[in-house]
Amino acid sequence: MYIYWILLGLAIATEITGTLSMKWASVSEGNGGFILMLVMISLSYIFLSFAVKKIALGVAYALWEGIGILFITLFSVLLFDESLSLMKIAGLTTLVAGIVLIKSGTRKARKPELEVNHGAV
């Protein structure tokens, strides 16, 4: 089961890299950023598609998108001098709270109990 969480982590990391490279491509010369964006976002969807084999789709997608937005925003501030207003901080805080609630509200499906037949009476 852990491999699927690792795949989800890879999906998140490649989504962050792909989205940041989109911004990098828009402010720099050449096509390197666009190529990196295409490769990373493609890999992100591939990793996500494998992760949802064992992780609930709603949970996987919420984590993928939510954690992606959080880190893309933080890296955009650090790398591209974008602003981080109080309203953005409040939104990110709400996002993190939502991710925690979605993850904590997910239960594993119970395995069906085996019926024991002690013989016909």
Curated annotation (Swiss-Prot):
<keyword id="KW-0997">Cell inner membrane</keyword>
<dbReference type="GO" id="GO:0031460">
    <property type="term" value="P:glycine betaine transport"/>
</dbReference>
<dbReference type="GO" id="GO:0015199">
    <property type="term" value="F:amino-acid betaine transmembrane transporter activity"/>
</dbReference>
<dbReference type="InterPro" id="IPR023740">
    <property type="entry name" value="Spermidine_export_MdtJ"/>
</dbReference>
<feature type="topological domain" description="Cytoplasmic">
    <location>
        <begin position="53"/>
        <end position="54"/>
    </location>
</feature>
<feature type="topological domain" description="Periplasmic">
    <location>
        <begin position="23"/>
        <end position="31"/>
    </location>
</feature>
<dbReference type="GO" id="GO:1903711">
    <property type="term" value="P:spermidine transmembrane transport"/>
</dbReference>
<dbReference type="GO" id="GO:0005886">
    <property type="term" value="C:plasma membrane"/>
</dbReference>
<dbReference type="GO" id="GO:0015606">
    <property type="term" value="F:spermidine transmembrane transporter activity"/>
</dbReference>
<dbReference type="InterPro" id="IPR000390">
    <property type="entry name" value="Small_drug/metabolite_transptr"/>
</dbReference>
<feature type="transmembrane region" description="Helical">
    <location>
        <begin position="2"/>
        <end position="22"/>
    </location>
</feature>
<feature type="transmembrane region" description="Helical">
    <location>
        <begin position="55"/>
        <end position="75"/>
    </location>
</feature>
<keyword id="KW-0813">Transport</keyword>
<keyword id="KW-0472">Membrane</keyword>
<comment type="subunit">
    <text>Forms a complex with MdtI.</text>
</comment>
<keyword id="KW-1133">Transmembrane helix</keyword>
<feature type="transmembrane region" description="Helical">
    <location>
        <begin position="82"/>
        <end position="102"/>
    </location>
</feature>
<dbReference type="InterPro" id="IPR045324">
    <property type="entry name" value="Small_multidrug_res"/>
</dbReference>
<protein>
    <recommendedName>
        <fullName>Spermidine export protein MdtJ</fullName>
    </recommendedName>
</protein>
<comment type="similarity">
    <text>Belongs to the drug/metabolite transporter (DMT) superfamily. Small multidrug resistance (SMR) (TC 2.A.7.1) family. MdtJ subfamily.</text>
</comment>
<dbReference type="GO" id="GO:1902495">
    <property type="term" value="C:transmembrane transporter complex"/>
</dbReference>
<feature type="topological domain" description="Cytoplasmic">
    <location>
        <begin position="103"/>
        <end position="121"/>
    </location>
</feature>
<dbReference type="Pfam" id="PF00893">
    <property type="entry name" value="Multi_Drug_Res"/>
</dbReference>
<keyword id="KW-0812">Transmembrane</keyword>
<dbReference type="GO" id="GO:0015297">
    <property type="term" value="F:antiporter activity"/>
</dbReference>
<dbReference type="GO" id="GO:0015220">
    <property type="term" value="F:choline transmembrane transporter activity"/>
</dbReference>
<comment type="function">
    <text>Catalyzes the excretion of spermidine. Can also confer resistance to deoxycholate and SDS.</text>
</comment>
<dbReference type="GO" id="GO:0015871">
    <property type="term" value="P:choline transport"/>
</dbReference>
<feature type="topological domain" description="Periplasmic">
    <location>
        <begin position="76"/>
        <end position="81"/>
    </location>
</feature>
<feature type="transmembrane region" description="Helical">
    <location>
        <begin position="32"/>
        <end position="52"/>
    </location>
</feature>
<keyword id="KW-1003">Cell membrane</keyword>
<dbReference type="GO" id="GO:1990961">
    <property type="term" value="P:xenobiotic detoxification by transmembrane export across the plasma membrane"/>
</dbReference>
<feature type="topological domain" description="Cytoplasmic">
    <location>
        <position position="1"/>
    </location>
</feature>
